[in-house]
Amino acid sequence: MIAVSFKCRCQILRRLTKDESPYTKSASQTKPPDGALAVRRQSIPEEFKGSTVVELMKKEGTTLGLTVSGGIDKDGKPRVSNLRQGGIAARSDQLDVGDYIKAVNGINLAKFRHDEIISLLKNVGERVVLEVEYELPPVSVQGSSVMFRTVEVTLHKEGNTFGFVIRGGAHDDRNKSRPVVITCVRPGGPADREGTIKPGDRLLSVDGIRLLGTTHAEAMSILKQCGQEATLLIEYDVSVMDSVATASGPLLVEVAKTPGASLGVALTTSVCCNKQVIVIDKIKSASIADRCGALHVGDHILSIDGTSMEYCTLAEATQFLANTTDQVKLEILPHHQTRLALKGPDHVKIQRSDRQHPWDAWASNQCGVHTNHHHNTYHPDHCRVPALTFPKALPPNSPPAMVPSSSPTSMSAYSLSSLNMGTLPRSLYSTSPRGTMMRRRLKKKDFKSSLSLASSTVGLAGQVVHTETTEVVLTADPVTGFGIQLQGSVFATETLSSPPLISYIEADSPAERCGVLQIGDRVMAINGIPTEDSTFEEANQLLRDSSITSKVTLEIEFDVAESVIPSSGTFHVKLPKKHSVELGITISSPSSRKPGDPLVISDIKKGSVAHRTGTLELGDKLLAIDNIRLDNCSMEDAVQILQQCEDLVKLKIRKDEDNSDEQESSGAIIYTVELKRYGGPLGITISGTEEPFDPIIISSLTKGGLAERTGAIHIGDRILAINSSSLKGKPLSEAIHLLQMAGETVTLKIKKQTDAQSASSPKKFPIPGHSGDLGDGEEDPSPIQKPGKLSDAYPSTVPSVDSAVDSWDGSGIDASYGSQGSTFQTSGYNYNTYDWRSPKQRTSLSPVPKPRSQTYPDVGLSNEDWDRSTASGFVGASDSADAEQEENFWSQALEDLETCGQSGILRELEEKADRRVSLRNMTLLATIMSGSTMSLNHEAPMARSQLGRQASFQERSSSRPHYSQTTRSNTLPSDVGRKSVTLRKMKQEIKEIMSPTPVELHKVTLYKDSGMEDFGFSVADGLLEKGVYVKNIRPAGPGDVGGLKPYDRLLQVNHVRTRDFDCCLVVPLIAESGNKLDLVISRNPLASQKSIEQPALPSDWSEQNSAFFQQPSHGGNLETREPTNTL
């Protein structure tokens, strides 16, 4: 019963066969048209009459393969009634059945009898010139039932033709002007074998040469003069099936096709209502399925030619489709109905308005009118689409679509300026492109010293826009390729004075799915090769070459609207949404979010629909989606609501003043500072947190440093951008990375708050002496902290990093480093920081710097001890005179090391240690602790003579320099009411995390063993950390005697820096060293002690095994991997 009612609701959609097209000959091309057509064509009205000259060459004794009927003694004028398959006339692709022959070699046939015409054609000679008249193809107008789309087709010449006949073209009489129309496709020819082109299609361009405004003769000449391979831009028609859009149940679609021709549909499987169903996955452009307009991506295939697909596999369904005859009957459930079943849980309700969308109303306008909705793009969901967004196709039997010559805008529909562009073009194509290029060059020149992304200009319809660029990587699809087409200069060989534009994006192609590309975007470079100084043909060739590797990288320039940029308050943003294409926004829930708090936009994809509006910014609050409030929605629910939206998405946004970079709205002063470091430090310390939208603050300046000397940077200033990279929505670690990669010239965008804002700001930046930063300044020591509760003794600060050290080039030793701690005294207790060095090392001299802020090591206090320590202050016990004397001593030692060429390594050690410890502290410690009195990376700035870090050189018996790197001290957050169990747990976790690990530098000279002809050690690449490490050491060999240990990292080999090398580069250096080998190595003592505790057997030292070696946890998670090399 269900099946019966199911069938009764099916509607029938019938498509005519493509052979019923008025431009298509019969398959054999041997039958003349019927008598009715012959009588109708006896006289062509003057306004529909076209003419051309056909030149044929034949050898003596051969015929043209042409059958002519008519004459003065017959009914009608001489006309072509048949073209023999394979004959000269047929292969010329200039004649069609039904053409009238007016003259042969200048001889008018108006008064010739039929037999005289035949005799003339036989005896005319080798060169035959025919004057031919034909009926102009009818005009096809885009309306409610037909839409235009374009497709790019690449064909190879056969002889000197592509296997199709063209008619139409521009004419002096406007009533006779037509686009260049393909009226016949020769069976078996190149176009027929390729299968895309059908009679009635319009030829828009050949190898980028636009045919708009060209005559028929000029179009023929362009086709003849192009190369053996040409790319043709074809426009075809797709019918709009209202019955599909309004259907409430299954449909029976009948599609007629030529036997053996492909329908152009790719199938896949999906799950609907817990059952597997066969679904249309892709539809090939300009295929029969595309042109009929009844099939869409996502439609469920219920049956094929009466065979149910309920229990069929994908392979079986594909085979059924391939075996169909000239009449295909498909029972489908349209995709707009299937989406209802595929939607998420019912607790999310979305009600859509029945009002007409802007592009629906605009679709009925003339195709040459420009649109202000610059995000309108075609999607299969739309039953009607805007003109010139190139929707889907016309039924094969429809008359060839044409642009009416009488319409002043219709002919410009094919011009570049009338394309419906997603990007607002900088100017119309007719304006001077050199001016655009000059503005672009000036913009690039100014960009170096300015943080504005681009200067504002006026786009279409007077809208203010600015340009931005982005890089897009596309992976080709087997069916649709990349899915983009370019529009360039008039002549393919002409050098482009402005970049080519994207003129078409195919639906459901990689170009559309990436969500970044839109029609009208300028293609600046293809695979890194600029397009501005090349020809359009070269640009197209780059795209074709990329299709071989199925990957292309495009640099795109696009426009971002900025006519309306809300500075604060609540407003609505409407974004067009396409199926399977994301809007480009990422929403997140702050860790401190409470019920009723909004979600935050944490990322906006560059080039996406959301980005191009120019109104959305990182940090904006998302209040509602399509009038569904998100106050109590989780982030997952909000994402689901976004995904279920269709066609048009309405977002309710709230922008706070503190999230605005505008001076007028925020009341702040915003300016740009450019610093040239000339190899030195910047002299600034930045502070922040790992929360994306917490500010990055300048917390201290080095006295007399570069930043302080400018006079434009002050403590408390907020950094908005570093070298044009905005810090909005980025954590402190990202800002650190940007500073490290900044190079010699660093451009900072600074926001200086007003006094009122500074006073009322809830976030307080650390002041010198209480900052959680490592500085290289020489400020006065901080005052001793007053006794009080623990929340006062351990002030709340934010983690920070001294950019003066972070700015040094390169990455140092890839390990975590330990601390030579200072001594502190409290209430009669003396505590030392935990020292990992051996007793022998502790006897060496070590600097004890002046403390600026108090650090508190793990001292194992009991509950009572903790209570007692809250009532007493911590007093630093270092002697200032001794410290000053030791600073002078170690300053000389550092200078000595610099003269030996080791200063770069020291700086790298500092930088890497800083980054490692900072990131570890910020992530792990923040995970362990909670509460408002949390302080991360709290440490006193050290004297500049110590390069901003505590550094100790330890005299060893081998006279090798030993360098120990300090970690940052961390204050322990606590509340008075914390329980002892929690304190013990936190102390234990902090002890495990913050256990210091020293690093040693050694210079080793080895002499080759004369007996073994090697240096007695093997090396291996690091697995998790780059670099080359000592793996095994032969007992009593040169390496063992010289003091090498497993896990030693080779920093230099014979004075060649090998920090970034692998075994393939290091082994040849060692092999070329002869009998003497000079090494500079870095060592983690823990790894060496571990290797001593577990010595390798003598027989194991050179084994080439595949095992991975992992260093102990305090050694930076070092692992080595094959290949190993015995040296």
Swiss-Prot record:
Coiled coil: none annotated. It is a peripheral membrane protein. This is Glutamate receptor-interacting protein 1. The modification Phosphoserine is found at residue 43. It is found in: Cytoplasmic vesicle; Perikaryon; Cell projection, Dendrite; Cytoplasm. Residues 53-136, 150-238, 252-336, 471-560, 572-657, 672-754, 1003-1085 form the PDZ domain. Signal peptide: none annotated. InterPro entries: GRIP1/2 (IPR043545), PDZ (IPR001478), PDZ_6 (IPR041489), PDZ_sf (IPR036034). CDD domains: PDZ1_GRIP1-2-like (cd06687), PDZ2_GRIP1-2-like (cd06681), PDZ3_GRIP1-2-like (cd06684), PDZ4_GRIP1-2-like (cd06686), PDZ5_GRIP1-2-like (cd06682), PDZ6_GRIP1-2-like (cd06683), PDZ7_GRIP1-2-like (cd06685). It comes from Mus musculus. The gene is Grip1. Keywords: Cell membrane, Cell projection, Cytoplasm, Cytoplasmic vesicle, Endoplasmic reticulum, Lipoprotein, Membrane, Palmitate, Phosphoprotein, Postsynaptic cell membrane, Repeat, Synapse. Residues 752-802, 840-865, 942-980, 1108-1127 are annotated as: Disordered. GO terms for cellular component: cytoplasmic vesicle; dendrite; endoplasmic reticulum membrane; glutamatergic synapse; membrane raft; neuron projection; perikaryon; plasma membrane.
